[in-house]
Amino acid sequence: MTTSATVIIMVLCVGSLVIFSEGSIGFELVTPLPGKPDECPVEDGRTLAIGQTEQVPGQCEERTCIKMDDQLYFELAGCGISEAGPGCEMFESKAETYPECCTPEIKCN
């Protein structure tokens, strides 16, 4: 499969996921460390193996190390956009892990 065909399929799949789940999915190209061609490096010097998932520190999202067309990527899964209705306020969730942190607290007058 060509790279452009892979990207089109990914966009279609991601679009379907966003429409039905109200979440978000993104991809970040990763440059592997020398001698570790099948591992995604993270900020603190550790690496994630292909298929390994972890919570992104300080954010309400998780990342998974994936490989497509001989390139490494982080697949980032997050909450998407939430809105409170008229007369309501939205507050960040107190949960610390994804996806539980995606559910905001809503208070209405």
UniProtKB/Swiss-Prot annotation:
Any Gene Ontology CC annotation: extracellular region
Protein known as: U-scoloptoxin(16)-Ssd1a
Sequence similarity: Belongs to the scoloptoxin-16 family.
A UniProt-annotated Pfam family: SVWC
Taxonomic source organism: Scolopendra dehaani (Thai centipede)
Molecular function terms from GO: toxin activity
Keywords: Disulfide bond, Secreted, Signal, Toxin
Modification note: Contains 4 disulfide bonds.
